Swiss-Prot record:
Inhibited by zinc. The gene is algE5. PANTHER family: S-LAYER PROTEIN (PTHR38340:SF1). GO terms for biological process: alginic acid biosynthetic process. Hemolysin-type calcium-binding repeats lie at residues 388-403, 406-422, 424-439, 557-573, 574-590, 695-709, 712-729, 828-839, 846-862, 864-880. GO terms for molecular function: calcium ion binding; isomerase activity. InterPro entries: Beta_helix, Carb-bd_sugar_hydrolysis-dom, Hemolysin-typ_Ca-bd_CS, Hemolysn_Ca-bd, PbH1, Pectin_lyas_fold, Pectin_lyase_fold/virulence, Peptidase_M10B_C. This is Mannuronan C5-epimerase AlgE5.
Amino acid sequence: MDYNVKDFGALGDGVSDDTAAIQAAIDAAYAAGGGTVYLPAGEYRVSGGEEPSDGCLTIKSNVYIVGAGMGETVIKLVDGWDQDVTGIVRSAYGEETSNFGMSDLTLDGNRDNTSGKVDGWFNGYIPGEDGADRDVTLERVEIREMSGYGFDPHEQTINLTIRDSVAHDNGLDGFVADFQIGGVFENNVSYNNDRHGFNIVTSTNDFVLSNNVAYGNGGAGLVIQRGSYDVAHPYGILIDGGAYYDNGLEGVQIKMAHDVTLQNAEIYGNGLYGVRVYGAEDVQILDNYIHDNSQSGSYAEILLQSYDDTAGVSGNFYTTTGTWIEGNTIVGSANSTYGIQERADGTDYSSLYANSVSNVQSGSVRLYGTNSVVSDLPGTGQQATLEGTTGNDTLTGSEAHETLLGLDGNDRLNGGAGNDILDGGAGRDNLTGGAGADLFRVSARTDSYRTDSASFNDLITDFDPAQDRIDLSALGFTGLGDGYNGTLAVVLNSAGTRTYLKSYEADAEGRRFEIALDGNFAGLLDDGNLIFERPVIEGDAGNNALLGTSAAETLLGHAGNDTLDGAGGDDILVGGAGRDTLTGGAGADLFRFDALSDSQRNYTTGDNQGDRIVDFSVGEDKLDVSALGFTGLGDGYNGTLAVVVNSAGDRTYVKSYETDADGYRFEFSLEGNYQDLGSESFVFATPSGQQLLEGSAGNDSLQGTAADEIVHGGAGRDTLSGGAGADVFRFSELTDSYRTASTSFADLITDFDLADDRIDLSGLGFSGLGDGYDGTLAVVVNSTGTRTYLKSYEANAAGERFEIALDGDLSAFTGANLILDERVVLEGSDGNDTLDGGSAAEELLGGAGNDSLDGGAGNDILDGGAGRDTLSGGSGSDIFRYDDALDSFRNYGTGVTGTDTITDFTPGEDLIDLSALGYTGLGDGYNGTLAVVLNGDGTRTYLKDRESDAEGNQFEIALDGDLVDRLDAGDFIFAEAAATTAIEVVGGTPTEEQLVA
C-alpha cells in the first residue's frame, strides 16, 4: 500500500518543516504491516531530534521510502541546524529492522547553512550486541552536502544492497560499509567527497563491490580496512570492475584485511599509489588497468607493505603475505617509481605473473621477500611453500597451489590438488603431483642420477603429459636424443611400466643424470612438457624480423638491419652487425653486444649503424658490454662509456668517444630519457686491477698474477701473494687475521710492495697507525728484520687481537698503505657555506652557519652542524646525521628558528641518524620520541620534540613534501630500537577515522 506524505500534511515547498508529516506516513505504513511512503517531486525540509541517534526520519521494518527521482524529490536539512544528526534517514537505534529501504530521491545535508556532524543514510544494530538489521535496499539515491558521511550502513547488517546511487560533496566518506555481511554495492558513483569515496570497514565480510566509480575524493577512491577498533578484519571482499581515479591518496587501499580480490578495474590519476596493500593477507589483484598514478610525488603504481600496529589498539605487527598479482596492465606516470614494489619490512610470498609493466622510472618490479616470485608466464598459483629438511621428509600439499621443496634426504612429496611445483632436491625422492597442472623441477644433475652399479633417481608417480611439465632448464641439456652430446634418451623398461629420461654421459664421479616416470610415455614426451635450455631464434645476413614468444629465448640477428622483439620471457637479444631495432618486451631482458662493430657510428662520414633499444626498463633489463672491454660509465674515454641525452630529451645515447682506425666508435641509443642511467644497468668487463681472489673459511693459499687484484683470504690462517701489479689485501672481519696471548692465527702477506700495494681495513674501525692502542695499529719488525707485523694490542672479549704478518722489513710502512675510510670529506667553515658533492660517496660537514649541502650522486653522509641548513642528498642512499640537538631546533617562546630542511628525503632509501641525540622512536614527541607533523597546506613534514631544553629550544627537522604516511622507524637510526606509535597529522586529513554513531 502507498502512503503519500502530502496526505499527512507534508508540503514539499522548500520552506516548511515536513519532518512530522513524513514520519507520520512512515509510522502509518509500519502500523499497517508495511508499505511504500511516497514523496512527490519537491523539496522537503526536515530537522533532527533531541539526540544525534534520533536522526531526522526513522524508517521501520517493511517500509520503503520512494521519491519521484534523484533531484526531483529532495529531503533537505533545515537552515541553521547546529546539532549532530546521525542519519537524516535512519533505522531505529537499538531495534532490529528488516526489509526496508529507499529509492529515487536526494538527501541534502545543507552543509553550507548548518553546523554539527550530519550523516545522510544510517542503519545498523547496536555495536557489539547480538542482532542485526536485515534485507536493506537503496536504489537511485543521491546523497550530497553532508558534513559527515553520505551512505553510512553502520554495524551489524545482513544483506544490504546499494545500487545506481550517487554520493558527492560530503565531509567524510561517500559510501561506508561498516560490519556488513553478505552485501552489495553496485553501479554507484562517489565523487568530490572530502575523504574516501568508498570505505569498507570493521569486520565487513562476504561483500561485493561491482562496477562502482570513485573520483575526485580527498582521500582514497576505495579503502578496505579494519578501522580503529581491535576487531576482526574485513574478509571475503570482491571488487569487480569500476574505476577509481583522480583521488587525493590511493586509488584503492587494502589495509588490515584478508581474502580480498580486486579485478577488472581501471585505476588511474591518483595522488599516491594506484593500489596499496597494507598489512593484508591473501589479496588478489587480477586483470586491472592501473596507470598514471603518483600524481603527488614519487610512488609505485602498486605497493605491498606491512603495517605496524604494535603501538596501536591491537599491539600487533601485520605482515603483508600471499599477495597474488596477475594479468594487470600497469603504465606509469612521469613520477611512478616501480610498477610493483614490495617494502623491505617482512612483506613476502608475493606472486607476480603475466603483468605488463611500462613507463616506470626505477624498474618494473622491486621484490624483497625471500619467497616472492615474478614471471611473465601465467601463474600456477603458488601462494605457499612447504620446505623439508636435510633428512627424509614427507610433504603433503592441499587443494591450493603450492611449492614443495624436499631438500636433502629421500623425500616423499605429494602436491595434492592445485597447480603445484615439486622439487625433490638431493636424494632419491618420490614425487606425486596430484590433481592439477604440476611442474616437476630438477635443479641439479646430482638431484637424480645413477652410476654403473646403483640408482639414485627420483620417481614421478603420476605424470600427465597433457598438463604436467618437467623443468630441466637448469641442467644444460639441449633436448631429446640418444643420451649423448647434451641430449636425453627416452627409455622404456621391458615390462612397459616405467619410462626413463636419461643421459649416458657421466661426470667425473661416474654419475649420469636419470629420472623415472611411472607408466609408458614412449612418444608422449616433447618440448610441450619438457623444459630444456633457452631456445635460440636466429636470423641470417639479411634484414631479419625475429619475434619471440612468452618463453625465455635468445634472439640472434647477425648481419643486416634487423628487428628483434623478445615478446614475453626473460630474453637475450643480440642484434649483431647492422643497424638493429631491439625490443625486449615483457620480462627481464638482456641486450648483448659481442663486437664493437655490432653498433657503431662514424661522425666523419655520417655512417650510422647504431642499434636502437625501444623499451629498456631500468632495474629489470640489462646492457651487456662485457665482451667489448668497457669497464664502467664515465666520459667515454679510457674504457668508459658516456651517457648523453639529446636536446629533445626523448633519446639517450650510450657512447664511446674513442674511434677505431676507420673512424668508427661504439654507440647505441635508448628511446626515452635515461640521464640517470647507472652502472647497475650494465654488465661491464672486469676492470683492470679489480680481479677478486676470494678465500674460504680454511687456511688458504692465494696467489695473484701480474694484474691488479683484490685479495681476500677470509677466515683461517691464510698465505697471500698479490703478484705483480697494484694489489689490495682486504680484511673485512677482525677474525680474518688475529692472534691470542698464546697462539697466532695471523695471515701472511708474502710480497707486499710499499710503492703499489695497500691493505684494506675500512670495515674494522681502525683510525690509523700508532702504538696499537686507542684504535690504532702498531708497525713492528722482528729482531732479524725478516718479518713485519701490523698489530693491535687491544683484544676483544674472546682475547683475540688483530694482527697481520708481512714478509720482509717494512718499517717504512705508512698510513698511505692503508685503506681506512674511502669516503671523501667536504668540510665547511663557521660561515654560510655551499658544499656540492660529486658522484662518489662523500661526507659533507657544514659546521656553523646557514649552510647548503648537496650530496649529488653516491651514498653520502650530510651533517649540517649548527645553523639553519638546507640539505639535499641527491641520488643514492644518503644519511642525514644530527650530532647535537641544537643543530636543528625551534624556540616557540622567542620565535627563533634554526630548523634544517631536508629537500629530497626518500623513505625506504635514505636515513636520518638521530642516534647521538638519544631519541628512541616515533611517537607523540614526549619521552624520547619524535612526533611526525604535517603543515596546514600539506607541503612540509616536521619531526618534532615537544619537550624543551632549559632555554626553551625544541629539536625539530623539516622535510619537504607530505611524508606522514610514508615514514616509519625503518627510516631512522635511533638510539635504541622502539616500536612505532601513532603519528599526528596537523592540518591534513587522516586516512582512517573511527566511525562513531
